[in-house]
């Protein structure tokens, strides 16, 4: 459960990310593909090379979804319902992949914002991403 302090940390972080969301989302995807090659199987039609337009585009989708979740942190199920349906029923993404991408997002954010990435912010973002992952996998059952 996200505390009021966690929610503030998440919202503050997303404000700092600002216009870099798509860039960070794409970088996190690239990290995931390189670190966990099995995740590539969900993107057989993508050019997965560094800087590809498809990875950039999907990175923007990831960033936009997370920005929406951060803006609606008190109603994650409502904010992410359509994405949960999509990933569970159409794309059939293995739930473990959300944890892998979450880890890569944390690494990316820490690399770009080391001064702001305090232990408290790290913990808040980790809890937020875990909550997002839980909501995204809720319709698998």
Swiss-Prot record:
The protein's matches in SUPFAM superfamilies, at most eight in alphabetical order, are given as: Globin-like
Question: In which tissues is this gene expressed?
Answer: Red blood cells.
Give GO MF terms, alphabetically.
Answer: haptoglobin binding; heme binding; iron ion binding; organic acid binding; oxygen binding; oxygen carrier activity; peroxidase activity
Q: Kindly name one Pfam family recorded for this protein.
A: Globin
Q: Phosphoserine occurs at which residues?
A: 3, 35, 49, 102, 124, 131, 138
Question: What are the entry keywords?
Answer: Acetylation, Heme, Iron, Metal-binding, Oxygen transport, Phosphoprotein, Transport
Which residues of the sequence carry a binding annotation for heme b?
87
Task: Report whether Transport shows up as a keyword of the record.
Answer: yes
Which residues are reported to carry the modification Phosphotyrosine? 24
Please describe the quaternary structure of this protein: Heterotetramer of two alpha chains and two beta chains.
The entry assigns this protein to a family as follows: Belongs to the globin family.
Q: What is the purpose of this protein?
A: Involved in oxygen transport from the lung to the various peripheral tissues.
Identify this protein by name: Hemoglobin subunit alpha
Q: Which species is this UniProt entry from?
A: Spermophilus citellus
